[in-house]
Regions:
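Multi-pass membrane catalytic core of lipid/isoprenoid biosynthesis enzymes
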Residues: 54-107
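Residue-level signature of the transmembrane alpha-helical core
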Residues: 16, 36-39, 68, 93-96, ...
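A general structural signal for well-ordered alpha-helical segments in protein cores
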Residues: 75, 102, 123, 129-133, ...
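Topogenic membrane-insertion module of multi-pass membrane proteins
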Residues: 1-47, 128-145, 149, 156, ...
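Alpha-helical membrane-protein architecture signal
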Residues: 33-36, 61, 65, 119-122, ...
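Short, structured loop/turn "capping" segments at alpha-beta junctions
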Residues: 87-89, 116-119, 133-137
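Interhelical loop and helix-boundary elements at the membrane-water interface
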Residues: 1-12, 50-68, 110-129, 179-186
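Membrane-water interface of transmembrane alpha-helices in multipass transporters/channels
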Residues: 86-88, 149-153
C-alpha cells in the first residue's frame, strides 16, 4: 500500500519517467499526447510540492529530486523544440545553462552549510510560470490549428520573456551566492 507521505516523491519520479515517453511521442509525431504530458508535468509539479507541505511529507530526496526532475523534463522538451524549429538554440541554451548554474550554486552552498537553502525568489517563480506557458503554447503549434502562426508568435514571446527572466534571476542568484559564500568563509 502506498503511504500518503510517499505520493509527492512518486509524482516527482513520474515526471522523470515522462522524459523518455516525451521523446517517443515526439519522434512519432503524437503531438496531442505530448501536450497532455506537458499538462501532466505541470500539474504534478504543483501537486508534489503542495501535498508534501500540506501533509508534512517533505523529504530530503524530494527536495533534491523535484528540481532535477523539472529541469530534465523541461530541458528535454526545449531541446526537441529546437530540433523542429519551434525554439531558438541560443535562447534554450541560456535557459538550460542558467538552470545548471543555479543547481550547482545550490549544491555548492549546501556543501558549505548543510542547512542553507538558496531560496526561490518571486521573480524566479514568474520565470517558471512563463516557461511553462511558453512550452505549453509551443506544444500547440504542430496540432494543425488554423492559427498556428499566431500561437507560435505567442509561444516565442513567452520563451523570450523566460530567457530574459532566466538570465536576470540567474545573475541575482550568483550575487546572493557570492555574498553567502563570503559570509560562510569569514
Amino acid at each position: 500500500m502506498i503511504k500518503l507521505n510517499n505520493i509527492p516523491n512518486i509524482l516527482t519520479i513520474s515526471r522523470l519517467l515522462c522524459c523518455p515517453l516525451w521523446l517517443l511521442l515526439f519522434y512519432f509525431d503524437l503531438y496531442i499526447f505530448c501536450l497532455i504530458l506537458i499538462v501532466y508535468s505541470g500539474v504534478t509539479d504543483f501537486l508534489d510540492g503542495f501535498l508534501a507541505r500540506k501533509y508534512d511529507a517533505t523529504s530530503i530526496i524530494g527536495k533534491a529530486l523535484d528540481p532535477i526532475a523539472d529541469k530534465i523534463f523541461t530541458s528535454t522538451v526545449l531541446i526537441t523544440f529546437i530540433v523542429d524549429s519551434r525554439a531558438n538554440f541560443i535562447v534554450v541554451s541560456a535557459i538550460i545553462i542558467r538552470e545548471l548554474m543555479v543547481s550547482g550554486l545550490r549544491e555548492a552552498l549546501s556543501n558549505y552549510n548543510k542547512s542553507y537553502l538558496l531560496e526561490v525568489t518571486f521573480l524566479a517563480k514568474i520565470k517558471t510560470a512563463s516557461q511553462f506557458l511558453a512550452i505549453f503554447i509551443l506544444a500547440l503549434v504542430p496540432l494543425n490549428i488554423s492559427f498556428s502562426n499566431t500561437i507560435y508568435s505567442f509561444g516565442t514571446i513567452f520563451l523570450y520573456v523566460t530567457a530574459i527572466l532566466t538570465v536576470y534571476t540567474g545573475y541575482k542568484y550568483v550575487i546572493i551566492s557570492i555574498k553567502e559564500l563570503k559570509n560562510i568563509e569569514s
